[in-house]
Swiss-Prot record:
It comes from Macaca mulatta. May be part of an oligomeric complex which is likely to have a transport or channel function in the erythrocyte membrane. This is RH-like protein. Keywords: Membrane, Transmembrane, Transmembrane helix. InterPro entries: Ammonium/urea_transptr, NH4_transpt_AmtB-like_dom, RhesusRHD. SUPFAM superfamilies: Ammonium transporter (SSF111352). It is a multi-pass membrane protein. The chain crosses the membrane at residues 12-32, 44-64, 77-97, 125-145, 172-192, 203-223, 238-258, 265-285, 287-307, 331-351, 358-378. Belongs to the ammonium transporter (TC 2.A.49) family. Rh subfamily.
Length: 417
């Protein structure tokens, strides 16, 4: 019988992380340079503001978003920052190497950081499905694999399907959610008896998690429009995302009250469903020209998110044996699928209205890229999950799931365990 005491990562984590960081520094030294071309100062400032918004979403939004478990909030915030800092470095190099087939150094621009931050956010979303069940070393391995597969998928979509960066990034939520869920399916389960209390939420952590939701809610229009170069598409994305978020927030509170026998509002439902509209608009926001379409999509996404939160843990997760701790499926996965299907339907309607073979071809491309994203996320997630089960990573024992005390120093405690 294996020990229930947490396995120390004192040697494994510093060795792995610092070696990786040293390798990244060498790669940046030999293969990158700052782009020296003159840019319009006003455009540079605007571009930096977009980078700043994305960083706020990644650090504060996704960091606090997963801090609702009362004994796992420290890991949520700090691991999120660590993985973002490491992932952006790897994503910049990866995008540079994959996007230029000819040998030479990679030019680093603000757009490179913007693209890398969005790519890394896919990992931060996937992490929600396994947070509390893996250590930081396993998360680093998971990040390297996911960012590599995600970057490769985008390059394949860009070069084979001829879809630009703004469009092929719309699969980020679908890829991230189902990659994370597949990894979670591979990890040891179920939770042993006596640790259910660690999976409970309390007032203060739930409030911080709601703070993360608010940061994400405020900056989601920037997230959906960050990589769009056409001014009209960017305007449509900002407007449509805002209306969808507004309706999903109203839906979250209203339907949460309706779902409770006493008419009380569930903070967890609010925490998840308020963002559903923004997630659902990630694929189609740039092609929606009327507010009512975005509002209807936000309403449906909110309903799906709350319905998933109420039914999926019983009907779906238990059947498939998936235990994911932070509502990834019905906060990101299902609303994102709704958005992808909506985009395909909107493009199909344009075929009917315009009788254009080119638009019809684009519908087929959109369906193909969605299928590719799903296939690559599930396949790579399965392989990553099997890789994380190897004993060399010193993963935590199931008795220490969702327990910050397994990784953090608590000076006020006289006895560690």
């Amino acid at each position: 019988m294996s020990s229930k005491y947490p396995r120390s990562v004192r040697c494994c984590l510093p060795l792995w992380a610092l070696t990786l960081e040293a390798a990244l520094i060498l790669l940046f030294f030999f293969f990158t340079y700052y782009d020296a071309s003159l840019e319009d100062q006003k455009g540079l400032v605007a571009s930096y503001q977009v980078c700043q918004d994305l960083t706020v979403m990644a650090v504060l939004g996704l960091g606090f978003f997963t801090s609702n478990l009362r004994r796992n909030s420290w890991s949520s915030v700090a691991f999120n920052l660590f993985l973002l800092a490491l992932g952006v470095q790897w994503a910049i190099l990866l995008d540079g190497f994959l996007s230029q087939f000819s040998p030479g150094k990679v030019a680093i621009k603000l757009f490179s950081i913007r693209l890398a931050t969005r790519s890394t956010m896919s990992m931060l979303i996937s992490m929600n499905a396994v947070l509390g069940k893996v250590n930081l070393v396993q998360l680093v391995v998971m990040e390297l694999v996911e960012l590599t597969v995600f970057g490769t998928m985008r390059i394949v979509i860009n070069n084979i399907f001829k879809i630009d960066y703004g469009m092929n990034m719309m699969h980020i939520h679908v890829f991230a959610a189902y990659f994370g869920l597949t990894v979670a399916w591979c990890l040891p389960k179920p939770l042993p008896k006596g640790t259910e209390d660690k999976y409970q939420t309390t007032t203060s952590p739930s409030l911080f998690a709601m703070l993360g939701t608010l940061f994400l809610w405020m900056f989601w229009p920037t997230f959906n429009s960050a990589l769009l170069l056409n001014p009209i598409e960017r305007k449509n994305a900002v407007f449509s995302t805002y209306y969808a978020l507004a309706v999903s927030a109203v839906t979250a509170i209203s339907v949460s009250s309706l779902a409770h026998p006493g008419g009380k509002i569930n903070m967890t439902y609010m925490h998840n469903a308020a963002l559903a509209g923004g997630v659902a608009l990630s694929a189609s926001c740039h092609v929606i020209h009327s507010p009512w379409i975005a509002m209807v999509l936000g309403l449906v996404a909110g309903l799906i998110s709350i319905g998933g939160a109420k039914c999926l843990p019983v009907c779906f997760n238990r059947v498939l044996g998936i235990h994911e701790s932070h509502s990834v499926h019905y906060t990101f996965g299902l609303p994102a699928l709704l958005g992808e299907i909506t985009y395909i339907v909107l493009m199909a309607l344009r075929v009917v209205w315009a009788s254009s073979n080119m638009i019809g071809f684009q519908v087929l491309l959109s369906t193909g890229t969605l299928s590719l994203a799903m296939a690559m996320s599930i396949t790579s997630g399965l392989l990553t999950g099997l890789l994380l089960n190897l004993k060399i990573w010193k993963g935590p024992h199931v008795a220490k799931y969702f327990d910050d005390q397994a990784f953090w120093e608590f000076p006020h405690l006289a006895v560690g365990f």
